[in-house]
Each structure stands twice: as structure tokens, then as C-alpha cells.
Amino acid sequence: MTLTIYNTLTRQKEPFEPLEPGKVRMYCCGITVYDYCHLGHARTCLVWDVVRRYLQWRGYQVQYIQNFTDIDDKILNRARKEGTSMEDVSERFIKAYFEDMDRLHIQKADAYPRATHTLDGIKRLVYELEQKGYAYPADGDVYYSVRSFSDYGKLSGRKLEDLQAGASGRVDLEDSESQKKKDPFDFALWKAAKPGEPSWESPWGLGRPGWHIECSAMVRERLGETIDIHVGGSDLIFPHHENEIAQSEAATGKPLARYWMHNGMVKVGGEKMSKSLGNFTTIRDLLAQFDPMAVRLFILQTHYRNPLDFTPKALEAATNGWQTLQEGLLFGYLFGEKLGWDQLSSNSSVREDNPLVQQFQDAVDDDFNFAGGLAVLFEIAKDLRKEGNILVHQEKTETSPEKLKEQWQTLVQLSQVLGLEAHPPQVHRETTDGLTDAEIETLIEQRTQARKAKNFAEGDRIRDDLKAKGITLIDQSGGITKWHRS
């Protein structure tokens, strides 16, 4: 079966044909680093992690880039509130991001460009747009002239005449800015410096970049003028991705991306999970209650384009589902020796003509239907669980040891494609240099006091020292820190 992708741009499923055979260039709009990530962020990062894993499993060489927005009003507001700098806030929450993603078993991108590290490319792109007549300066600001780009609205399907200015919370429509714009739909590419805010030299004076221009510059600098797949949450379709297209395609005259993919939002009580609504659950709070693999399973059981309804009952059901898969994944470690397997390895390649592999691929090839792929995994896991129970009670199995080994290897490898892994039982190794629980709690309290005193360097030192000794700290909302031994 041919891999098909639902393309937001064309509003239909299309066969996947990369620009260069065997290679995929993929860009994901990342987070604004001003707070801890919530389940909505987890879904976005996890979905594209598994899309990337699947493309690699299908034989593609994937170059995957995900950005950090580290210049933003929300970051500046937090820095002012804490009496620290924009850089301190960004660095702290970038570290927290990686801690959360590591626990969710999300692979690192090939690069994480930041807005502050891409300023030269941003200024070049703004200058190009101005020279080509798509942008205009106004008292130190530079605005993109939306009506100058005839294809504006092609991604979202929105027409300017049908829109009300300011429909998106990310469009700047403060009175002073509105007066500078030639059209209320125009958006800022470069913002003039304001007192007390970071700023950089530019042809238009001191200032900082607008939000939309950052991604256009990063894509161009890291992946080229046209890429294979551009991804992000569905809340970014308009205006962010629409504006990206307008900027990039006006500058180059080429399509920004061949395929546009968007994941649905996580919802709570019918509303989008977001910090602004206060209805969010942070990843670290969630992982204090649920196994990371259960959270992965919860996210993958709903098609990536559909909304995901978050309820405790749904997580509990995913936990039960993970226990079933986990039993199957551990089957070889628990029963392999008893079955006389000559070599306990899950790495032997599975046959391409294996019907279970074909069922899995046929499901996921249909616009990344991970739920369909999971159905195949559950079928294998339940068979292995049944055979394990028979072996325990009757000292025999209904299926041959050779067939069971093939089933187990198939389950392990297909689960790895989805980032689902169960660690084999092993004897606990002492890795904490003899630290007692009380000593660990004392160090955590010292770190808490250092952070309250805005001494984030000391707090980071204590955390890193504990990590080197096999102690992982999990910061949660409300100033609570939990820990576990690796």
C-alpha cells in the first residue's frame, strides 16, 4: 500500500512523494518557552515524533527540525514578574521541556533553532520582503502587506473580506499599531524597541522580530526554500502558518512545503486545553500519576487530526491497555528461556511478508492511522498473554516456541515504531552514591530556597549533581518537586 497523507493545503489525502527520493525534510513549529508544557504540547510533540519514527521505519532518511520561540511578550512578562531576564526564563523552560520529552520517550530533533540565534536570517528575509514590495516600514516597525500576496488564505480557506480584524489572539491590534498599518490585516515582521525590552540593531533601528517571521527564516536557513512536510497544531493554521506561507512564498516564489499536516487539539469539557483558560494539566503533573507509556498510548489511540478529549477515566483505560501491551512485550524475557529460545533477542529483523507487519503497515499508511496499527499490537499481545498463562498453569503452549518467538519479536519491533517500550526486569543497581532519602530531600529543599532567591544557577547545579548520582527531579506546579532513583 502507498503511504497517503491528508494535506491541509489541498484538503484531501494524497500519496506521499518526497521532493528527493528517500529523503524527507520536516519542520515542526515548537513551543514558546515561558512555562511548563501541558498535555496539549505533549500531543503535538508526540504525534510528530511517531510520524518521524514511522517514516524512518519505512526507509526514509528524515531531517527533522523543531524551533523554540524565545522572544515573546509572555516570556518578557514572566521575566518582569520574577525579576530576572528573558534568557533566564527561556533557558529554564527549555531544560524543563527536554526533561518532559525524555520521560515521554520523544526523540530529539536534529536541531532546535531559536529566534535569538536566527536574527541575521530574520533581518535578511524582512529586508527582501520590503525590497520586493510585500512589506513597509512604519516608525521603526515593519509590516507585511497582506493584500499584496494574492494567495493569502489558501491554507486556511479564509478570505480577507470574510474576516474581522483581530480574530486571532496573535494578531497585534493595539491602537498605536493599528494607526501605523495600511490595512488592519497587516502583521508585524519587525517591532520597534520598547523601553526595558531586549532589542537588536537592524536597518529599521533597534527592535525585535515578530512571531511569524521567525519560522519562515528558520525553515529557509535549516532546510531550504521548499520542504517536504510542515507540521504543527491545528490552532496554528491561521494566522501563523498562513502568514508563514505569505512571507516565504513572496520572498522565494516557491512553495514553502509540499505537505501541511496538523494535529487536533486536546480538549477538556469541550474546550481547548490552554494556559489562558487555566484548564491545563502539565506533563510533569500527569507523569506523577500515570506511566509515560500509558500517556503515549492514550494520545495514539485517537487519530492525530481529531480532537482528543482528556478525562481521568480515559487515562485509566489507557493504563489498562498499556498493561496488556506490557505483558506481551515482556513475554520473551519472562518465558524465553523456559521455551528453549537459543538466543533472547528482540532485534532480529521480522519478515516483510509477515501478515501482522502487513496489517500494521496497511493501517498506518492510511494517513498515519496509529489506532489501526495499535489494534494489530493488541492482537499479538493478547495472544502472547494467553500463551503465557497456559505455560504457567500447564507447562506447555498451544503455539510452537518458534512461532511465539516470531510473534514476540514482531510485537517489540512494531511497538518501537510507535515509541512504546517495556524495560525487562533487572536487578536494581545502586547508582546514588549511598545518598539516603533524607539527604536527597535536604538537597531538594536547598535547591528550592535557591530558586526562591532567584539563584537559578545554584538550583541548576544541585539538580545536575543529583542527576549525576542517579536522582531525577520532577518540578511540578505549585512549587512541588518530586524525585525518583534512576
UniProtKB/Swiss-Prot annotation:
E.C. numbers: 6.1.1.16
Binding site for Zn(2+): C29, C215, H240, E244
Cofactor(s) essential for the protein: Zn(2+)
BP terms from Gene Ontology: cysteinyl-tRNA aminoacylation
Segments forming a coiled coil: none
Keyword Amino-acid biosynthesis among record annotations: no
UniProt-listed Pfam families: DALR_2, tRNA-synt_1e
Catalytic reaction(s) noted: tRNA(Cys) + L-cysteine + ATP = L-cysteinyl-tRNA(Cys) + AMP + diphosphate
Cofactor info, note text: Binds 1 zinc ion per subunit.
GO cellular component entries: cytosol
Residues that, per the record, bind ATP: K275
Domain of life: Bacteria
Disulfide bonds: none
Keywords from the named record: Aminoacyl-tRNA synthetase, ATP-binding, Cytoplasm, Ligase, Metal-binding, Nucleotide-binding, Protein biosynthesis, Zinc
EC class name: ligase
Motif annotated as 'KMSKS' region, chain positions: 272-276
GO molecular function, one term: ATP binding
Chief place where the protein resides: cytoplasm
Keyword Glycosyltransferase: no
Compartments, record wording: Cytoplasm
Quaternary context: Monomer.
Family: Belongs to the class-I aminoacyl-tRNA synthetase family.
Protein known as: Cysteine--tRNA ligase
